[in-house]
């Protein structure tokens, strides 16, 4: 909240509208001189931001009050994230390795990589995996060794897909 100093009592004038004259309009930055006047280089620091407020004193006389505004930091204030809670930029950080994830579900699935649990077991060889997708990829190695499961009854050809075998049989 901006607190303004009290205006000294103003004697009642004949004109009900007593205001400070508006400031002259000037460009915010000095223009570059010389042949490259269209260049985008800016000389010197940025001028201070001014806030002008139209106020009315206790006698009903309007006046303007100008204050210099402080530069506000851009964006929300940054702070360090504690493990498992939303981080300063992206989301949820892992307490083990400090990786940051957008959702708590992604963090939860990532934390499996730090544990020793391997709940997905291959039925053919007994090898265990942390993720079901890794088990599915492993099962393909067993299928590749055995060969395609669908064999043509008329010739020695084999197919991965039953629809491919059916099309092949029609060609015989």
Swiss-Prot record:
Keywords: Chemotaxis, DNA-binding, Inflammatory response, Isopeptide bond, Metal-binding, Nucleus, Repeat, Transcription, Transcription regulation, Ubl conjugation, Zinc, Zinc-finger. It is found in: Nucleus. A zinc finger (C2H2-type) spans 92-114, 120-142, 150-172. Residues 19-30 have a biased composition (Pro residues). There is a cross-link at residues 31, 118 (Glycyl lysine isopeptide (Lys-Gly) (interchain with G-Cter in SUMO2)). SUPFAM superfamilies: beta-beta-alpha zinc fingers. GO terms for biological process: cellular response to hydrogen peroxide; chemotaxis; inflammatory response; positive regulation of endothelial cell migration; positive regulation of endothelial cell proliferation; positive regulation of gene expression; positive regulation of interleukin-8 production; positive regulation of leukocyte chemotaxis. Pfam families: zf-C2H2. GO terms for cellular component: nucleus. Residues 1-92 are annotated as: Disordered. InterPro entries: Znf_C2H2_sf, Znf_C2H2_type. One of its GO terms (molecular function) is DNA binding. Interacts with SMAD2. Involved in the regulation of endothelial cell proliferation and migration. Mediates H(2)O(2)-induced leukocyte chemotaxis by elevating interleukin-8 production and may play a role in inflammation. May be involved in transcriptional regulation. This is Zinc finger protein 580. The gene is Znf580.
């Amino acid at each position: 909240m901006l607190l303004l100093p009290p205006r000294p009592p103003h004697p009642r004038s004949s004109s009900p509208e007593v205001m400070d004259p508006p400031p002259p309009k000037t460009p915010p930055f000095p223009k570059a001189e010389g042949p490259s006047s269209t260049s985008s280089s800016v000389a010197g620091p940025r001028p201070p931001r001014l806030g002008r407020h139209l106020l009315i004193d206790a006698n009903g006389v309007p006046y303007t009050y100008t204050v210099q505004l402080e530069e506000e930091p851009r964006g929300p204030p940054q702070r360090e994230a504690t493990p498992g809670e939303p981080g300063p930029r992206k989301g949820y950080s892992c307490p083990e390795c400090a990786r940051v994830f957008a959702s708590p579900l992604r963090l939860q699935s990532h934390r499996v990589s730090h544990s020793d649990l391997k709940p997905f077991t291959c039925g053919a060889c007994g090898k265990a995996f942390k993720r079901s997708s890794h088990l599915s990829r492993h099962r393909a190695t067993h299928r590749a060794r055995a060969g395609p499961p669908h064999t043509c009854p008329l010739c020695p050809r084999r197919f991965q897909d039953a629809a491919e075998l059916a099309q092949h049989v029609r060609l015989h």
